[in-house]
Amino acid sequence: VGGDSHAPACGAFGAYMFGVGATDMAAVAATGQTWLKVPRTHLVDLQGELGAQTFAKDIILALCGAHGMDMAGYEALEFAGPAVSAMPMRARMTLCNMSAELGAQAGVIAPDDMTAEWLASRAPDRVRLDDQPDSYWASDAGSHDGRHFSLDLDTLVPQAAAPHSPANAAAITDHDDAAFSVAYIGACTGAKLDDLRAAAGILKRRKTASSIRLLVAPASRADQDQAACEGVMGILEDAGATVLPTACGMCAGYGPNRLAADDVCISSTARNFRGRMGAPGSRVWLASPASVAAAAVTGRLTDPRGMGN
């Protein structure tokens, strides 16, 4: 149980984790207990492979655009299929994190060898998945008692969601033109190490447009430090990015960089509800970090394909 609506990010590790409000969280802290109605589980079967400059964020936005924000009806989603098995852990975190935008109580991915390796590299004395057979971590037969969704990643292209809902998502090339005053790469869903690398791949040897502010808030200090060691942070700063502290910050409308009434922002965050990132008059588009970086270069909504290294 977590005190944030994006607590389901931990589903990437096979944990059934969901967010609750302050009152319920206080009760959990006091008693160590909470109540939960066992939900149905809907299967999201991901086939194929992600193409150039297309990421887990594009998968979620495509699902939001196709099925809306009540796709899961506050029940559980399990992401599965060969595309999920091939995904690195940070991409899996993005899928489970934004299951909330699909109306899910929790998003889950069954643990596998990649999960075990990730956990062993970070907490070898506390977490051992090999204490149990692989079948222990797999979904039970018949457990997907809800709806079945499928998405062919071979045909997926970079997505963007227009204001003021993730459900307004469509292929970038299907949207009307849009100009931006702010580009934001941040939040738990859009500024992990792989996200920073993707943005740097677009911004290397390029500069941001004079009409736009590029703001970057890495998802964690550990990811920021590793990105710095790899030269990623230097590429972002050389392109014109201002690096902000690792915090929720602008994603929740906090801090001195919150959006003004006349700002139009393209953001790698999870939500673009009216007023979420600042003034109610501001407008927020959602996209992958690579697409945000591409927009930072041109100042406009831009397909990132062909811009990477």
Please report, for each region that a protein language model flagged, where it lies by residue.
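Fe-S-dependent hydro-lyases/dehydratases of central metabolism
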Residues: 1-309
